[in-house]
A protein has these predicted regions:
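Non-catalytic accessory segments flanking enzymatic or RNA/DNA-binding domains
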Residues: 1-270
Length: 270
């Protein structure tokens, strides 16, 4: 039996418009040929940890087995709460990994997905992080030498700015809004506590991001491989980490990390 390939977060690049590829065992599979065509993704029932590769019966937090959830640096609490990061102190689940990924330059940014939110990412993850969120525009507002400091700025700004994306609103046709980003930057500058002001930037300009979407559905329904092991339909586009189908169903690839799948050739009906 073909066990298929484990899903991972989609690869994304930006050259005028976002280009997407699935990260599969045999290498990246470009998704542009599938847009406007029938697309079928079949779960094989196999699950494997995104960190250690071990086959398991259950996955946690976007693809980890339980032992890796509690020990892998990629699953540490500071991934979602950067203010708790200890990398700059030489500490963490894996100090070498922490040095490479967290004790390095980070940015604090504002992204626009229909509303403004504040976030943190490693400098080398710009603009990929914004693409993963489905942002149509984003603006860097601070640049710092390590993750924990970026987290402190984010926590302080969460008093006046949202820090989460409304995925349903994001999956609509959202026009870029530079005015909203610049107004939020002014609000952030006034709100940020004095000892963090030295890191604030006023000379950055917003970046626009366009997605490969033929048409946006008026209403979206999220589907999962646990409930629907064969996901098939006309692929109308991709935004964030979501595949958008003609009938309004949407599939979050990243949330299915570690799920093994097989994919039919372009235009093949289920």
């Amino acid at each position: 039996m073909n066990d298929g390939s484990p899903l991972r977060k989609m690869l994304a690049g930006l050259d005028g418009q976002v280009s997407y590829a699935l990260s599969l065992i045999d290498g990246p599979m470009e998704l542009a040929p599938y847009i406007g065509q029938s697309f079928t993704l079949r779960a094989t029932g196999v699950l494997s940890c995104v960190s250690c590769g071990r086959r398991v019966k259950k996955l946690f937090a976007q693809g980890f087995c339980y032992p890796c959830l509690t020990s892998a640096p990629e699953a540490a609490e500071c991934i979602v709460r950067p203010e708790l990061c200890r990398a700059h102190l030489g500490e963490g689940r894996d100090p070498e990994w922490e040095r490479a990924h967290h004790d390095t330059e980070h940015v604090v940014y504002l992204s626009y997905t229909g509303a403004v939110k504040v976030g943190v990412t490693r400098s080398t993850q710009v603009p990929v992080r914004w693409i993963d969120q489905g942002a149509v525009a984003a603006l860097i507002i601070a640049r710092v030498p390590y993750r924990q400091l970026a987290g402190l700025i984010e926590v302080d700004l969460k008093r006046v700015l949202a820090d989460r994306t409304n995925w349903r609103a994001m999956l609509k046709l959202v026009p870029s809004d530079h005015d909203a980003l610049l107004a939020a930057r002014d609000q952030a500058r006034l709100a940020l506590r004095e000892d963090l002001q030295q890191h604030f930037l006023l000379d950055e300009v917003p970046m626009d991001i366009a997605y490969p979407v033929l048409a946006y559905p008026p209403k979206v329904t999220s589907v999962s491989l646990e409930k629907e092991p064969v996901v098939s339909g006309r692929l109308m586009g991709i935004k964030g980490q979501y595949l958008l189908f003609e009938d309004g169903r949407v599939f979050n690839v990243r949330n299915h990390s570690g799920h093994h799948v097989m994919i039919d050739p372009p235009g093949t009906a289920a």
